């Protein structure tokens, strides 16, 4: 069994930014890949994609209850655009409607912004896990900004010890190994939005901040979706083996399906780790579905 902890779709995708799947297209993709169920994360922040409602996600999941699991989401600026907005009321409302988590949170704000911290506080109060995407710039991007070394994430983990926070995306996974320069944390594009600018140097294999944070804070979990964890975990298979052994109970398979025309090698990657003996069958089962079943109460 495979559960995708991080996926997206729209009932009626718009022809802008990226070609998302509709529900039927996502089911077809999942069938091809051997994915049994997928968590659907509503996009509510307008920094890059067009916002969708939590109710759209609930309607999709109600139509295909055996294939999709709903999350809810809310922009931290919603309701009163302040650090005391009663966001917990919204989260409680959608939790009662069946939503199993929160995300993908990705406004281009600082992680320690009081309004963002208010959202995390509400998530902890309601008792739902939260996944966010990060950024290494404070404007012109999507995702919560953090400093090199992920100090804002660490302070958030300290402040909300009962909140399960999922690390995800380039800024998080760039720090699996020690950075050579802060610019390695993210991607910068040409003004026309085409090719990526710059060339990265030799890849480090010295342990970075992420495993240190995982050892310090049991409320930090890892979302293995998008290409960045696959790239990082392909650098040194000896280290990858140790990483999966040590953190096997907090790693979750995911794809971050947000372009129906792109190849997603995630199932092949995790199966190859099993075939090559990098991970055991027990770890494979945990990462592909057992951890998600436990987390979401399925």
How would you describe each model-predicted region?
Residues 1-37, 245-252, 258-298:
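Mid-to-C-terminal alpha-helical segments outside catalytic/metal-binding sites
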Residues 1-19, 53-83, 210, 218-221:
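Mobile, glycine- and charge-enriched loop segments
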Residues 3-7, 38-40, 69-72, 102-104, ...:
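Hydrophobic faces of well-ordered beta-strands that scaffold small-molecule active sites
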Residues 6, 30, 57, 61, ...:
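Conserved, mostly hydrophobic/aromatic
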Residues 8-10, 43-45, 73-77, 106-108, ...:
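Active-site beta-loop-alpha junctions enriched in small/polar residues
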Residues 14-17, 51-53, 116, 142-144, ...:
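Short aromatic-enriched loop/helix-cap "lid" or pocket-rim segments at secondary-structure transitions
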Residues 36-37, 45-148:
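Active-site gating/metal-coordination segments in enzymes
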Residues 113-253:
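Catalytic pocket-lining loop regions of alpha/beta-barrel enzymes
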């Amino acid at each position: 069994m495979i559960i995708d902890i991080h996926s997206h779709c729209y009932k009626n995708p718009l022809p802008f930014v990226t070609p998302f799947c509709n529900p039927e297209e996502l089911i077809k993709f999942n069938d091809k890949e051997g994915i049994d169920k997928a968590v659907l994360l509503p996009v509510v922040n307008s920094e890059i994609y067009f916002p969708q409602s939590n109710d759209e996600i609930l309607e999709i999941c109600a139509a295909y209850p055996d294939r999709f699991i709903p999350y809810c989401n809310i922009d931290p600026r919603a309701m009163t655009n302040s650090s005391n907005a009663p966001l917990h009321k919204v989260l409680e409302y959608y939790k009662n409607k069946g939503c199993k988590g929160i995300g993908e949170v990705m406004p281009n704000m600082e992680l320690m912004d009081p309004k963002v911290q208010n959202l995390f506080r509400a998530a902890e109060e309601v008792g739902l896990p939260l996944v966010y995407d990060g950024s290494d710039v404070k404007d012109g991007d999507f995702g919560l900004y953090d400093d090199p070394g992920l100090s804002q994430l660490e302070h958030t983990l300290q402040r909300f010890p009962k909140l399960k926070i999922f690390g995800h995306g380039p800024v998080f996974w760039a720090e699996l190994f020690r950075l050579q320069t802060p610019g390695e944390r993210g991607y910068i594009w040409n003004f026309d939005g085409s090719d990526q600018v710059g060339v990265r140097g030799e890849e480090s294999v010295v342990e970075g901040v992420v495993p240190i944070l995982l050892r310090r804070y049991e409320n930090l979990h890892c979302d293995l979706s998008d290409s960045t964890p696959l790239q990082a975990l392909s650098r040194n298979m000896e280290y990858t083996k140790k990483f999966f052994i040590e953190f096997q109970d907090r790693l979750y398979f995911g794809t971050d399906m947000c372009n129906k025309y792109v190849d997603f090698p995630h199932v092949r990657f995790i199966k190859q780790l099993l075939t090559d003996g990098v991970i055991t069958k027990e770890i494979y089962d945990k990462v592909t579905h057992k951890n998600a079943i436990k987390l979401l109460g399925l």
